[in-house]
């Protein structure tokens, strides 16, 4: 079980990403545009660097919704492999069952 502070930190990061997503996208478009002048590009780079570090989507970590476990996360279900197996064995995941061949 992950510490509650880690879960809270990830929730805060998710909020920051959502809050600054539009601004980051606009600045990145200016930076990557070939028609932008060097001065405008440099200003956009400085503004992008001034944004909060945690507002970058790359800093988010996928975590299990039940335990907060960061490894063995299955995106399709939002659970770690351990909790997914437990839920499957209880029959709580429709269409999913233990393989047998």
From Swiss-Prot:
Q: Which domain of life is it from?
A: Bacteria
GO BP: translation
GO MF annotation terms: rRNA binding; structural constituent of ribosome
GO CC entries: cytoplasm; small ribosomal subunit
Q: Which PROSITE patterns match?
A: RIBOSOMAL_S14
Residues crossing the lipid bilayer are none
Please name one Pfam family that this protein belongs to: Ribosomal_S14
The UniProt keywords, alphabetically, are:
Ribonucleoprotein, Ribosomal protein, RNA-binding, rRNA-binding
InterPro entries recorded: Ribosomal_uS14, Ribosomal_uS14_bac/plastid, Ribosomal_uS14_CS
What this chain does, per the entry, is described as: Binds 16S rRNA, required for the assembly of 30S particles and may also be responsible for determining the conformation of the 16S rRNA at the A site.
Question: Which protein family is named in the record?
Answer: Belongs to the universal ribosomal protein uS14 family.
- Subunit relationships: Part of the 30S ribosomal subunit. Contacts proteins S3 and S10.
For this entry, the protein name equals Small ribosomal subunit protein uS14
